């Protein structure tokens, strides 16, 4: 295995990971894998600090995409009614609450294939107003062309989330209305506009371990790896094609977190959806393996989230404190 720099094998900006290298790391004995991941985590971050984000659904339901996991897809049979774009003042009031609760980043998500021209003035106003509160901004709005990415960048958007979800091989089994290449094109447009990239995937879609590894290799081998890598555990939502998906083995999930930390040592790795089904012990292992960001609050889009009380209790017991300043 080629040298990646650093005594624990930190990846650098030059050089690329092969699937074979990543697979060999993923298949290490569990303790060896976590030892390596935690060493890299300590080299690049304070292991007792965590970045807190708040996610708000600013436009719910009615998305024309057929993502098999998503309750907001128009193809989901769950009776979810599509909403209009949320009023700007409502978005800002929720941002004030998020900051008061300790969030340093405010993420705004809309169930669209891509934003329309008519929505751009409201979106840029949201970005500018949230930034004026001293919060980092993130949006996830579907696909972006270069023009819309530039407009969001001009408004000061810090991060754009667009997950690749899974491996290129397995992707067509989950989504048919948007190609894997479409997702990579959006990430390129975001990066070229000067916006930081947030991109990760979902475990529990029916994929194999190879798909999880390949997904992370794809992200690590982008011209610049994402600054933020969300790792989701599928929440089977009623009415979706994956409503009866089998649960993910907790230790396999921790392995993916550890591999993400090793392949992308300078990125924030975020525990995202599915934490309500994770034990405190499982989350603690994820933090040890390199996860250092999470979403706070009781809901994530249309799904449940552990809530601030449970999170505060867990972090206090682990001696982990929230980042008080925006990460560089």
Curated annotation (Swiss-Prot):
Pathway: Cofactor biosynthesis; biotin biosynthesis; biotin from 7,8-diaminononanoate: step 2/2. NCBIfam families: bioB (TIGR00433). [4Fe-4S] cluster binds at residues 63, 67, 70. Its cofactor is [4Fe-4S] cluster; [2Fe-2S] cluster. InterPro entries: Aldolase_TIM (IPR013785), BATS_dom (IPR010722), Biotin_synth/BioAB (IPR002684), Biotin_synthase (IPR024177), Elp3/MiaA/NifB-like_rSAM (IPR006638), rSAM (IPR007197). Belongs to the radical SAM superfamily. Biotin synthase family. Binds 1 [4Fe-4S] cluster. The cluster is coordinated with 3 cysteines and an exchangeable S-adenosyl-L-methionine. Binds 1 [2Fe-2S] cluster. The cluster is coordinated with 3 cysteines and 1 arginine. Catalyzes the conversion of dethiobiotin (DTB) to biotin by the insertion of a sulfur atom into dethiobiotin via a radical-based mechanism. Pfam families: BATS, Radical_SAM. GO terms for molecular function: 2 iron, 2 sulfur cluster binding; 4 iron, 4 sulfur cluster binding; biotin synthase activity; iron ion binding. Keywords: 2Fe-2S, 4Fe-4S, Biotin biosynthesis, Iron, Iron-sulfur, Metal-binding, S-adenosyl-L-methionine, Transferase. One of its GO terms (biological process) is biotin biosynthetic process. It comes from Brucella canis (strain ATCC 23365 / NCTC 10854 / RM-666). It is an enzyme of class 2 (transferase). Homodimer. Residues 48-275 form the Radical SAM core domain. It comes from the Bacteria. Transmembrane segments: none annotated. It catalyses: (4R,5S)-dethiobiotin + (sulfur carrier)-SH + 2 reduced [2Fe-2S]-[ferredoxin] + 2 S-adenosyl-L-methionine = (sulfur carrier)-H + biotin + 2 5'-deoxyadenosine + 2 L-methionine + 2 oxidized [2Fe-2S]-[ferredoxin]. [2Fe-2S] cluster binds at residues 107, 138, 198, 270. This is Biotin synthase. Its EC number is 2.8.1.6.
